[in-house]
């Protein structure tokens, strides 16, 4: 221990080391150009989605107020053309980012919370608790998640909240198994035994030692789960089981297919939402892989 550390309180030392770890992680992350590019594009997309109500008028999405012709090609007035109802495809694509990202982030938070809770509980307590929770997890793993999400969306009232719940309740098993494996690794280390020998209870061991060790891996996995949630949301909307009143990228694809945009060669109704989905998922994947490379010691070698 250095002289500086002896003059600091244990809490101050812990916070300083955490700041140093965060700074080191950020430096290692920024070295990866693909991950950094993905993060920048995601930041621009999220900021644009948040500021869109200030920068644009949502009334342009109203079919009764649309003043463009049906399926007009891209022009100086409508950069990405219009849909079957005369609405601007560019405006719909921008507003669709709000719903798609909202569902993606919200469903991911729900699934990660469920998966982390089940994974830590199963690994920490072991025994019959682990057996029951893991069999429950395996049951959800063997079920087709998309089919289960469609069933939930069909049974529950249609709406954005229903889509979030349907995706969140079907996307957690992989996170649970990942967290359980990491928790078992952490709890096999000597400092966990010392904490228990000193009288540390379950909450102390999990909160002070297990959870901080699991969170970096959960963070890296979360970015990948968001991309999967965005795809699931687009799929549900495309199949017609999403929110019928919401403008999302999947709903745009579903509308284009049902209204004959494909048969009429109106590619501008298909490419913008399709490219938006691909780019957002690609960016989340790049960021997730970058974080995994930084936070997983085995991938650094």
Features from the language model and the residues they span:
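Glycine-rich helix-loop "coupling/hinge" segments at transmembrane-helix boundaries
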Residues: 141, 152-155, 182-183, 225, ...
